[in-house]
Amino acid sequence: MDVEMRKVKFSEYFKNRIKDIPFAVMCALYMAFCVGCMIYSAVELGARDALLAVVYMIFIPAVFVFEYLIGFRVGYILTVLIIFSACGGLLGSSYNIYMILPWFDSLLHAVSGILFFAAGFMLAEVFFGKDNVNKHFFGKLAFAIFFSTTVGVAWEFFEYLISETMGFDMLEDAMVTDIQSYLLSQSHNVAIELNDITQTVITYDGGKEEWVINGGYMDLGLYDTLNDLLIAAAGTVSIAIVSIISFYKFPKFNKMFIPELVNNRRKPIEATASAADTAETAEAVDDGVAKESDNLSDSVSDNVSDTVKDND
């Protein structure tokens, strides 16, 4: 007999989810960090950075919403990576960490490749199902790799659009000392090479103002975009290799890292007292009918036997 199920309300799911103490503590610390950044930014830095802190606060509620809608559970490893990536993005954008630690942006993009690989693998489990895990593992792996690289490209599109439409410089500039350009020669057959560039002079405002850049020629985001894509792809491929090794040698790691599909949105409906009473009554009636039928059958059998004896 099929058990009737009911949909779990988001509030009920949320209450059960935060009973996971380590997960709840990590989420609470992250939210406190964002609130602190928002207050500090509003007082010391300006409205832009305060708004950015508010935007980053959405990350944790988004995790709860996606968990509930899709039906998966984020493990501790992935939670730490999500929080690290979000905190790093906020610190880099508002507190000049990208300038203090030039390699920090590359680290965040490598982590993003790992995160989106995990998300892609989880979505593959939604599509392929959790059955026959060994059979579909490499199909899920390929899907996760393609998903992660696609999201990486989409993110670079997003950075470009924000930079062009809202005036945020999301494309990090780079200083280069050597360039090759067809534009300088006005021909696609000959590329002009400029080597050992030490200074760039920019004349602007109709020739009234001049800005001198020492140290080379400033590239406006091309190197940053390609470097971000390569680093994210490297992070994706690295975690894919780790997942393959874990699949054969350490399967517990994949279970800890990949979001787990769980049935957290539906639960059995408990029988009410009236329903239970109805069931018991129906069962009693069935038993009574069966006993009455047996008694009638025995009576008929006895009558037939007596008739046969009298005839004899």
Question: Where are each of the predicted segments found?
Answer:
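Short, Lys/Arg-rich, polar N-terminal cytosolic tail immediately upstream
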Residues: 1-17
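Membrane-interface helix-boundary motifs at transmembrane edges
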Residues: 16, 66-77, 130-136
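Aromatic-anchored segments of alpha-helical transmembrane domains
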Residues: 32-38, 83-95, 149-153
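Membrane-interface helix caps and helix-loop-helix hairpins in membrane proteins
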Residues: 42-47, 94-104
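Cytoplasmic-side transmembrane-helix entry/capping segments in multi-pass membrane proteins
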Residues: 73-84, 106-108
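Alpha-helical transmembrane segments that form the membrane-embedded catalytic/substrate-binding core
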Residues: 109-117, 143, 147-193, 200, ...
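Short, highly charged, low-complexity non-transmembrane loops/tails of multi-pass membrane proteins
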Residues: 253-277
